[in-house]
Amino acid sequence: MVRLILVTIITCMLCVPSTFARSFVVPLQANGTVHHIDKDSIQLAGQSSTMRMVKATMAVKSPKYEDIAYITYFYKYDLINRTIQKKPIILYMGTKMPYTYNSPYLDVSVVGSVDYIYANYAYYKEFGSYFSQDMIDRYGSTDLSTNK
């Protein structure tokens, strides 16, 4: 009986945090794919007088497949030219073996695109303000997430 209670407590301790710990941004849809960003994964990855870098993990789910891919992006913010670049690093697809995908940096320049909004959101969560003026004009200081 004691073992059963102990197993139940340990199971709850392992399952409950993994179920409720992650909180996501409002889902955005682009090209038939639903994206979410894991707020808990956003963290500073580096900074200098001319650049800031933020790491964020995204869940990408296609309506065609049951698998969810988890992609870790490094967003590089050029403080002088006011440009954003992204670099996808790791892709996990469902229960398959993870593999590393090391891409070159890609420009995030389409205003209003999913990548643009997420890059600005990651910056907002780390530094308290949006990186791009049009995001400030559009959202003010409003948090885009569903869970404030």
Q: What is the role of each PLM region?
A:
Residues 1-4:
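Positively charged n-region of N-terminal signal peptides that target proteins for export
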Residues 6-7, 132:
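Short amphipathic alpha-helical segments that mediate assembly, nucleic-acid/protein binding
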Residues 7-15:
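Bacterial N-terminal signal peptides
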Residues 19-148:
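N-terminal secretory-pathway/extracellular module detecting exported/lumenal segments
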